[in-house]
């Protein structure tokens, strides 16, 4: 979210600012006295949207009110930390508070709620207002829900993608081929990106990877990578890292490549929704803005993955490639096994330990993660003509085995601010098999829920460590998994859910 910079409007009464040290995540909030003369003259009430003006800087915020003089006097306005930072004020400065201009693009949101398709202009207006911070979480939820109830068609998806690109920065690289990769998600522990970037960059291709934080999963790539190295890179730092090492693994929200998407993601996380059209627009807007020419898309398919069957995966792949082609981006979609978690760790730090094990060729490194990363890296190497058709996976495995991938990963981490050790949880508790038998099913959705209740991704060390895989023969009382938590409260939440959730790991006698 950014502050608007615009000419000052008609002179309005001013109020002295007070910093409340109130943390409201990304949403600017202001607090005013119920008897404040501005509230009376402007007709402002609690939860009104207000426009704050400090010189040329303007911020849209949500108003809350207080009685009495214990918190604020009648001539003061209290600011949350987000509002304070966006306005760029100092204690005692004066700002103007007024009604904001009418939010015209909401008419298009209402049309979408009632089942009407939106054209490029309508979507562009919505996205511009979202990026400018004019949409509240209620407005955002309405748009996202309407886009889920009546899924975006191909034209809407392409128009939304273009609108999201238009409000952000774009990068260009002095290379004929710039590769990227993305996983559509829904599969716990599938942390291939750091490995893929290391392999691809070690072979001389350019891969400026910007990744998101978790939306509905226990960890996103940025969450995991953050336990190993800084990911909040500004545009200049990102460019320096890529020019020096050929690749990076950075948080996309820090570089303003698709700022509207970062706002959408925050509300999608709270709604626990991730629809096809929004997913495609989110992924492609960031890849195109990052200057990519080619992208490999990992689509895990499984009974409890995000994509349940091959027909659905083929439809998604077709839609991705069709929309990407409108922007000159070549997309290669790879269907992968989504029947069970990848690797052993689920949660930022636990997944980071798996990544390190694969890159360092540890004897106990999860082989499924190694092979999946090699498959995806191989596709990128073939696209970039570093390997012949059908030979990319072998080159990727060779790059891991001879240590070049680990050396490149170390160099990327150092360039981003330094390699560090992931944290370990203070509390670890096993969930054991109630009977002997064979593991026949692992519920990815329940497993992700368990890891999130254990604190992931906010608690970096929280999550789940898997001890079994499909087909394993196990004894009664043998650990199926271990829950990792940073606090006793998070551990209790997770264990309570595990007791009520039914079979997370299904055993057949």
Swiss-Prot record:
Similarity comment: Belongs to the thymidine/pyrimidine-nucleoside phosphorylase family. Type 2 subfamily.
Enzyme's top EC category: transferase
HAMAP family: Thymid_phosp_2
Protein name as catalogued: Putative thymidine phosphorylase
GO biological process, one term: pyrimidine nucleobase metabolic process
SUPFAM superfamilies: Nucleoside phosphorylase/phosphoribosyltransferase catalytic domain, Nucleoside phosphorylase/phosphoribosyltransferase N-terminal domain, Pyrimidine nucleoside phosphorylase C-terminal domain
Annotated source species: Chelativorans sp. (strain BNC1)
Enzyme nomenclature, EC number: 2.4.2.4
GO molecular function terms attached to this record: 1,4-alpha-oligoglucan phosphorylase activity; thymidine phosphorylase activity
GO CC list: cytosol
Substrates-to-products reaction catalysed: thymidine + phosphate = 2-deoxy-alpha-D-ribose 1-phosphate + thymine
Pfam families xref list: Glycos_trans_3N, Glycos_transf_3
Signal peptide: none
InterPro entries found in the cross-reference section: Glycosyl_Trfase_fam3, Glycosyl_Trfase_fam3_N_dom, Glycosyl_Trfase_fam3_N_dom_sf, Nuc_phospho_transferase, PYNP-like_C_sf, PYNP_C, Pyrmidine_PPase_CS, Thym_Pase_Put
Keywords: Glycosyltransferase, Transferase
């Amino acid at each position: 979210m950014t502050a608007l910079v615009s000419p000052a409007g008609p002179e309005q009464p001013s109020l002295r600012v007070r910093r409340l040290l109130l943390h409201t995540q990304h949403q600017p909030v202001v607090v005013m006295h119920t008897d404040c003369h501005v509230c009376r003259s402007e007709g402002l009430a609690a939860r009104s949207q207000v426009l704050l003006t400090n010189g040329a800087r303007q911020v849209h915020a949500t108003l809350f009110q207080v009685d009495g003089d214990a918190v604020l006097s009648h001539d003061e306005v209290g600011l949350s930390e987000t509002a304070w930072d966006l306005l760029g004020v100092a204690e005692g400065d004066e700002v103007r508070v007024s009604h904001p201009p009418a939010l015209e693009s909401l008419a298009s949101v209402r049309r979408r709620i009632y089942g009407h398709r939106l054209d490029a202009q309508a979507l562009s207006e919505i996205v511009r207002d979202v990026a400018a911070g004019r949409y509240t979480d209620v407005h955002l939820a309405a748009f996202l829900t309407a886009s889920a109830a009546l899924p975006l068609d191909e034209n809407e998806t392409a128009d939304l993608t273009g609108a999201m690109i238009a409000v952000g920065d774009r990068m260009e690289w002095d290379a004929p081929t710039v590769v990227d990769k993305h996983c559509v998600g829904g599969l716990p522990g599938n942390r291939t990106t750091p490995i893929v970037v290391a392999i691809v960059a070690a072979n001389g291709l350019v891969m400026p990877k910007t990744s998101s934080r978790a939306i509905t999963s226990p960890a996103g790539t940025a969450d995991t990578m953050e336990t190993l190295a800084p990911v909040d890179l500004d545009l200049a730092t990102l460019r320096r890292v890529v020019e020096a090492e050929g690749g990076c693994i950075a948080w996309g929200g820090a570089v303003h490549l698709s700022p509207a998407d970062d706002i959408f993601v925050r509300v999608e996380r709270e709604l626990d929704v991730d629809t096809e059209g929004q997913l495609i627009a989110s992924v492609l807007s960031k890849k195109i803005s990052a200057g990519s020419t080619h992208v490999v898309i990992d689509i895990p398919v499984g009974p409890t993955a995000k994509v349940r069957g091959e027909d659905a995966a083929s439809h998604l792949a077709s839609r991705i490639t069709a929309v990407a082609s409108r922007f000159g981006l070549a997309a290669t979609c790879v269907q992968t096994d989504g029947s069970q978690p990848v690797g052993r760790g689920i949660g930022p730090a636990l997944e980071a330990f798996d990544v390190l094990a694969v890159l360092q060729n540890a004897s106990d490194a999860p082989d499924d993660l190694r092979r999946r990363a090699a498959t995806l890296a191989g596709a990128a190497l073939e696209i970039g003509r570093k390997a012949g058709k059908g030979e990319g996976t072998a080159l990727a495995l060779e790059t891991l085995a001879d240590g070049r991938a680990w050396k490149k990963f170390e160099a990327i981490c150092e360039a981003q601010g330094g390699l560090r050790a992931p944290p370990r949880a203070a509390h670890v508790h096993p969930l054991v098999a109630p009977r002997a038998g064979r593991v026949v099913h692992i519920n990815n959705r329940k497993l992700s829920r368990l890891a999130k209740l254990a604190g992931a991704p906010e608690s970096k060390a929280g999550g789940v460590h898997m001890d079994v895989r499909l087909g394993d023969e196990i004894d009664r009382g043998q650990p199926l998994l271990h829950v990792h938590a940073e606090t006793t409260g998070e551990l209790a939440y997770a264990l309570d859910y595990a007791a009520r959730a039914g079979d997370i790991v299904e055993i057949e006698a």
